[in-house]
UniProtKB/Swiss-Prot annotation:
It comes from Danio rerio (Zebrafish). The gene is cenpa. Component of centromeric nucleosomes, where DNA is wrapped around a histone octamer core. The octamer contains two molecules each of H2A, H2B, CENPA and H4 assembled in one CENPA-H4 heterotetramer and two H2A-H2B heterodimers. CENPA modulates the DNA-binding characteristics of nucleosomes so that protruding DNA ends have higher flexibility than in nucleosomes containing conventional histone H3. This is Histone H3-like centromeric protein A. Keywords: Centromere, Chromosome, DNA-binding, Nucleosome core, Nucleus, Phosphoprotein. Residues 1-19 have a biased composition (Basic residues). It is found in: Nucleus; Chromosome, Centromere. Residues 51-145 are annotated as: H3-like.
Length: 145
């Protein structure tokens, strides 16, 4: 027969209920906050930024980053599709070649958009129009196309 010491005694299966203490008025300095749950009369409003703030945050984020902006798989599909348009035979591409091509393409696009933005600012606008991009390409010349 096993011995039962005070450390190995079983606890009762159900916890015992204690009666609540006599209700006392809460102290004057402390107020309790009650949460009524999801069916509350005034749900918390979602924080909204002012117009343009989110765009400026996004601009700062992408100016700090050095990674690629386009996804690799769609860019590689585009490169393969363009290669099929210009040659009948199937071309194989190394991963490093695709990455180098993507780096060059993104650098070209960033420079083109910054030049087009300067054209829009010169025209006293902040919105880019296709004519700004066309003017930027025309000013750059043939060797930069």
């Amino acid at each position: 027969m096993p011995r039962h010491t005070s450390a190995h005694k079983r606890k009762p299966s159900t916890p015992r209920r204690r009666s609540p203490p006599a209700s006392l008025p809460p102290p004057a300095g402390s107020r309790t906050r009650r949460h009524s749950g999801p069916s509350g009369s005034s749900p918390r409003k979602k924080h909204k930024f002012r117009p343009g703030t989110r765009a400026l945050m996004e601009i700062r984020k992408y100016q700090k980053s050095t990674g690629l902006l386009l996804r690799k798989a769609p860019f590689s599909r585009l490169v393969r599709e363009v290669c099929q348009m210009f040659s009948r035979e199937h071309m194989m591409w190394q991963g490093y070649a695709l990455m180098a091509l993507q780096e060059a393409a993104e650098a070209f696009m960033v420079r083109l958009f910054s030049d087009a933005n300067l054209c829009a600012i010169h025209a006293k606008r902040v919105t880019l129009f296709p004519r700004d991009i066309q003017l930027a390409r025309r000013i750059r010349g043939v060797e930069h196309m």
